[in-house]
């Protein structure tokens, strides 16, 4: 059984230092990337992006900015229901392969089990099992996180907004929330995880071949 202290010892850079955080994420496969590949994304394209000279291709938009702004508040709501969960911002490495990476939004011990939380904001209903939830691949993202951190379950927390960015009284573009934060427990799915590992290892094989060709 993996302890929380053992998991925390595998933590790397925090997104508070964006350059270090991005540099560390480029060395392996993150949960978002593992989800993308498992849903049919191009292994070759992602491998090239990893190997080519580093650049920050991240392009923020109002939805991502809103999610980042709301995350600490949603985390506080989650902690009201799950007080053992603490907000987290670091990159974690797997004990079995340090190129398997994940950055959960919350982590904590639930008795002898390890729990995570993943936080999202959306204009859509993200109830697990709904068509929109299934289309996002968030289920796979959470499975990869649980695998990397040896967690037993993940609390999926989401907050819905009305997607109207023109009504804020202070003149700043922000939507209004239309539902309280919703939380659903997602259990670990070993069959899904095993399938994702197969895809991840194919990705690393391609990535290593590209690096070898560039050095030859």
Regions found by a protein language model. Name each.
Residues 66, 70, 75-77, 81-85:
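Gly/Pro/Ser/Thr-rich low-complexity, intrinsically disordered segments predominantly at protein N-termini
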Residues 3, 39-44, 70, 74, ...:
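Alpha-helical structural motif
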Residues 1-69, 163:
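Charged, glycine-rich intrinsically disordered N-terminal tails and low-complexity linkers that flank
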Residues 1-2, 212-216:
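Short intrinsically disordered terminal tails
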Residues 64, 82-104, 108-210:
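Nucleic-acid nuclease catalytic cores
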Residues 7, 34, 73-75, 144, ...:
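Intrinsically disordered, low-complexity boundary segments flanking structured domains
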């Amino acid at each position: 059984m993996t302890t929380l202290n053992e998991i925390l010892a595998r933590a790397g850079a925090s997104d508070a230092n964006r350059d270090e955080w991005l540099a560390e994420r480029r060395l392996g496969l993150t949960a978002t990337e593992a989800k993308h590949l498992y849903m049919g994304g191009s292994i070759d394209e992602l491998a090239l992006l990893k190997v080519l000279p580093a650049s920050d291709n991240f392009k923020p938009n109002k939805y991502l900015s809103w999610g980042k702004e709301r995350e600490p508040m949603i985390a506080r709501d989650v902690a009201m229901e799950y007080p053992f969960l603490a907000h987290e911002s670091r990159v974690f490495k797997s004990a079995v392969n340090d190129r398997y990476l994940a950055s959960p939004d919350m982590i904590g011990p639930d008795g002898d089990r390890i729990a995570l939380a993943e936080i999202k904001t959306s204009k859509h209903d993200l109830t697990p099992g709904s068509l929109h939830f299934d289309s996002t691949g968030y289920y796979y993202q959470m499975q990869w996180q649980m695998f990397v951190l040896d967690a037993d379950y993940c609390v999926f927390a989401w907050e819905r907004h009305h997607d109207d960015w023109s009504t804020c009284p202070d003149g700043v573009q922000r939507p209004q929330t239309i539902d309280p934060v919703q939380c659903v427990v997602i259990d670990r799915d070993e069959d899904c995880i095993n399938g994702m590992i197969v895809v991840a290892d194919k990705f690393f094989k391609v990535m290593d071949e590209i690096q070898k060709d560039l050095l030859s």
